[in-house]
């Protein structure tokens, strides 16, 4: 008896086509790691090879437009990581993969982990601009988290000494490469936040390969940077090196030297600002003196215009005209005119202006002297305040204390040594002098007994 519904009957071509479509649509693009064997490159430029492991193998093809982007020549026995599409070669029914990209297995796996972690943290919002903390301006203390023997530390200290020698720097030494490095970097960031000595941190190292920089692609380091209350400047490798730490940090600097430039002030620029302020002060004083002098000249001119001698000269002229007119008067008026002249002469003598002129001249001289004294006193006080400010700045500079022969010694934990009981034999010490640092090992500890005061 025949079944009620006939089963589907495939031709070979349709079967292979159906299987190919299933593989391409269901599997999609995958990452595969394996060992290369049977590698060939015909005249077409395409690559044909087999990927295998200990128990299986699969045929692979990588077309010319894709293999042009590969930066190395595949070798027999080489471990690689490929991104490929699974398909079926219909004419022979051979299952194979079409490779789109290829990387050496080590770097390829690291790159894959990098992309996965980057996508994860970005989805959580750790890269968002709203969480970026502004850098202090100016910074009062800089913390540096890096290897104490690396070139990055030397570059940072060199730039800071050149730009702002008085800026305090605290070093939190840590490994920056190897399995223990991520944990040490995290502890250094947490320690800097606990001690709260700095207002900005530089976290970084010099350049290297992807494996060398991998500590700064560690999720623990990224989350420690994000959680830091102190603003963090990342300075990992060269300008072309980009790590997860760069995305999480509050600011990314292309190199350690550039990070030092960002967090420091240019002392030469500060000096130019002081000089500019001094020039403006001198110009203001010159303007003030010129204005006072002009005002004094105006007052002096007005006083001259109202001088009693001028009034007397005008009256004298009028008197002469009257005398001329009286000389032509009638004889009967001469006596009366003479009497009137005598009366006028007496009144004029009683109103002699000389004492008033003398008092006015004395008052003017006093005003001139007081004005000169006030201007000299103000100029002297301004110069004295400026000199005191410069002297005070030089006196409070930490480098001035070091220049007088003093030094500061810190233990391995970064604490400043005040007593011998803070150290033990064999420990390493760091001594800060005027022109650099000295690292030394404690060989012997000799306490000094305090002298007893004599009782009288």
Swiss-Prot record:
Which GO molecular function annotations are given, in alphabetical order?
A: exodeoxyribonuclease VII activity; nucleic acid binding
Give a yes or no for keyword Nuclease in this entry. yes
- Pfam families membership: Exonuc_VII_L, tRNA_anti_2
Please state the span of the N-terminal signal peptide per the UniProt entry.
none
Recorded E.C. number(s)?
A: 3.1.11.6
A GO cellular component annotated for this chain's UniProt record is: exodeoxyribonuclease VII complex
Q: Which reaction does it catalyse?
A: Exonucleolytic cleavage in either 5'- to 3'- or 3'- to 5'-direction to yield nucleoside 5'-phosphates
Q: Which UniProt keywords apply?
A: Cytoplasm, Exonuclease, Hydrolase, Nuclease
Family matches, as CDD domains = ExoVII_LU_OBF
One of its GO biological process terms is: DNA catabolic process
Question: Where does the record place it?
Answer: Cytoplasm
Q: According to its UniProt record, where is this protein mainly located?
A: cytoplasm
The Swiss-Prot or TrEMBL record describes its family as follows:
Belongs to the XseA family.
Q: Which NCBIfam families match?
A: xseA
Q: PANTHER family, per this entry?
A: EXODEOXYRIBONUCLEASE 7 LARGE SUBUNIT
Q: How does it assemble?
A: Heterooligomer composed of large and small subunits.
- Its job: Bidirectionally degrades single-stranded DNA into large acid-insoluble oligonucleotides, which are then degraded further into small acid-soluble oligonucleotides.
| Protein name (database record) | Exodeoxyribonuclease 7 large subunit
Name its species. Answer: Shigella flexneri serotype 5b (strain 8401)
């Amino acid at each position: 008896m025949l079944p009620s519904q006939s089963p589907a009957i495939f031709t070979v071509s349709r079967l292979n086509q159906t299987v190919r479509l299933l593989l391409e649509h269901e599997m999609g693009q995958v990452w595969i790691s394996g060992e290369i064997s049977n590698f060939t490159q015909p005249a077409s430029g395409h690559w044909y090879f087999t990927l295998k492991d200990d128990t299986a193998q699969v045929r692979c093809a990588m077309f010319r437009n894709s293999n042009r982007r590969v930066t190395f020549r595949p070798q027999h026995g080489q471990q690689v990581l490929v991104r490929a599409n699974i398909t079926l070669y219909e004419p022979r029914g051979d299952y194979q993969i079409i490779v789109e990209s290829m990387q050496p297995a080590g770097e390829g796996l690291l790159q894959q982990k990098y992309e996965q972690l980057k996508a994860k943290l970005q989805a959580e919002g750790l890269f968002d601009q709203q969480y970026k903390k502004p850098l202090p301006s100016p910074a009062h203390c800089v913390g540096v988290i890096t290897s104490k023997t690396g070139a990055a530390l030397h570059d940072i200290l060199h730039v800071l000494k050149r730009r702002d020698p008085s800026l305090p720097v605290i070093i939190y030494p840590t490994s920056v490469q190897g399995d223990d490095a991520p944990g040490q970097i995290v502890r250094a960031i947490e320690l800097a936040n606990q001690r709260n000595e700095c207002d900005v941190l530089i976290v970084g190292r010099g350049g290297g390969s992807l494996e060398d920089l991998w500590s700064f692609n560690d999720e623990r380091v990224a989350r420690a940077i994000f959680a830091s209350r102190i603003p963090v400047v990342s300075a990992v490798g060269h300008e072309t090196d980009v790590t997860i730490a760069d995305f999480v940090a509050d600011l990314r600097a292309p190199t350690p030297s550039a990070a030092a430039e960002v967090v420091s002030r240019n002392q030469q620029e500060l000096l130019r600002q002081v000089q500019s302020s001094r020039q403006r002060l001198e110009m203001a004083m010159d303007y003030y003196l010129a204005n006072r002098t002009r005002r004094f000249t105006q007052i002096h001119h007005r006083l001259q215009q109202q001088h009693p001698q001028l009034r007397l000269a005008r009256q004298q002229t009028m008197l002469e005209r009257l005398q001329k007119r009286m000389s032509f008067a009638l004889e009967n008026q001469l006596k009366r005119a003479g009497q009137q002249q005598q009366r006028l002469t007496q009144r004029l003598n009683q109103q002699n202006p000389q004492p008033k002129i003398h008092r006015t001249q004395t008052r003017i001289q006093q005003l001139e002297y007081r004005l000169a004294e006030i201007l000299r006193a103000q100029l002297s006080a301004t110069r004295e305040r400026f000199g005191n400010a410069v002297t005070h700045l030089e006196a409070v500079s930490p480098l001035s204390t070091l220049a007088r022969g003093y030094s500061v010694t810190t233990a391995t934990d970064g604490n400043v040594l005040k007593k011998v009981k803070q150290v033990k034999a064999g420990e390493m010490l760091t001594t800060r002098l005027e022109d650099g640092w000295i690292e030394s090992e404690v060989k012997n500890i000799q306490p000094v007994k305090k002298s007893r005061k004599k009782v009288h």
